């Protein structure tokens, strides 16, 4: 099946999800105004209360979908508490959606270090200065922390904070949705079976 076919209604014939996702993300990168890799990340807290926020997908392969964060943040703590999460991409310009659910793994230190090294210097300083999700008394307090860490790491490399790393959602299900007239949408879900292979099914819209 050609990449063109993968991005039309024929996507329902795709045999596995990752090549299809790559084709759709490529389309979104060309079509969306910005942040085609922006994704809604859903977690639950210790009381089972759901939470959701936008993050940026920073990598994917057959092993899963990777994003990075402060592990001391609300989302970091919620994920560490359950080691499960869900994602939803919605590309409005393409009228497409992809939903991903599964257990979560922590990326290796080597993988986190490699990505951290690609971030702008200001973003690496920010990873140290921001006590993410905790109360902030004023903007000045944040800017002061940024200035302090900028001075501390004025020379040489900025090390990655131990509390800053990446998570990988290992998908159990990946669902593709494409808008059709009269809400008669196309939906296809891939589910990983006990052998690690993908079972595919169409769903009613």
Curated annotation (Swiss-Prot):
UniProt binding sites for substrate: 58, 115, 119, 123, 183-185
Listed PROSITE patterns: PYRIDOX_OXIDASE (PS01064)
InterPro entries referenced in this protein's UniProt entry, alphabetically: Pyridox_Oxase, Pyridox_Oxase_CS, Pyridox_Oxase_N, Pyridoxamine_oxidase_dimer_C, Split_barrel_FMN-bd
Cofactor note: Binds 1 FMN per subunit.
Pathway participation: Cofactor metabolism; pyridoxal 5'-phosphate salvage; pyridoxal 5'-phosphate from pyridoxamine 5'-phosphate: step 1/1; Cofactor metabolism; pyridoxal 5'-phosphate salvage; pyridoxal 5'-phosphate from pyridoxine 5'-phosphate: step 1/1
Pfam family for this entry, one: PNPOx_N
Cofactor(s) the protein requires to work: FMN
Keyword Phosphoprotein (UniProt): no
Key words of the record: Flavoprotein, FMN, Oxidoreductase, Pyridoxine biosynthesis
Catalytic activity, reaction form: pyridoxamine 5'-phosphate + O2 + H2O = pyridoxal 5'-phosphate + H2O2 + NH4(+); pyridoxine 5'-phosphate + O2 = pyridoxal 5'-phosphate + H2O2
Biological-process GO terms, alphabetical: pyridoxine biosynthetic process
One function term, GO molecular function aspect: pyridoxamine phosphate oxidase activity
UniProt-annotated binding residues for FMN: 53-58, 68-69, 75, 97, 132-133, 177, 187
Quaternary state and interactors: Homodimer.
Role of this protein: Catalyzes the oxidation of either pyridoxine 5'-phosphate (PNP) or pyridoxamine 5'-phosphate (PMP) into pyridoxal 5'-phosphate (PLP).
Family that this chain belongs to: Belongs to the pyridoxamine 5'-phosphate oxidase family.
Protein name in UniProt: Pyridoxine/pyridoxamine 5'-phosphate oxidase
Gene: pdxH
């Amino acid at each position: 099946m050609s990449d063109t076919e993968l991005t039309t209604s024929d996507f329902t014939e795709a045999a596995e999800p990752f090549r299809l996702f790559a084709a759709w993300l490529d389309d979104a990168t060309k079509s969306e105004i910005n942040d085609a890799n922006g994704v809604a990340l859903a977690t639950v807290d210790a009381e089972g209360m759901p939470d959701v926020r936008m993050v940026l997908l920073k990598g994917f392969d057959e092993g899963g979908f990777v994003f990075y964060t402060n592990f001391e943040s609300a989302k970091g703590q919620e994920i560490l508490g359950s080691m499960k999460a869900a994602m939803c991409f919605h590309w409005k310009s393409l009228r497409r959606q992809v939903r991903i659910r599964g257990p979560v793994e922590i990326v290796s230190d080597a993988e986190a270090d490699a990505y951290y090294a690609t971030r702008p210097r200001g973003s690496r300083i920010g990873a140290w200065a921001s006590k993410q999700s905790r109360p902030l008394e004023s903007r000045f307090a944040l800017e002061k922390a940024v200035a302090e860490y900028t001075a501390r790491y004025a020379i040489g490399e900025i090390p990655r904070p131990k509390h800053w790393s990446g998570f990988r959602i290992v998908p159990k299900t990946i669902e593709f949705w494409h808008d059709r007239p009269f809400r008669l949408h196309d939906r296809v879900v891939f589910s990983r079976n006990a052998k690690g292979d993908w079972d595919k099914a169409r769903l009613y819209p």
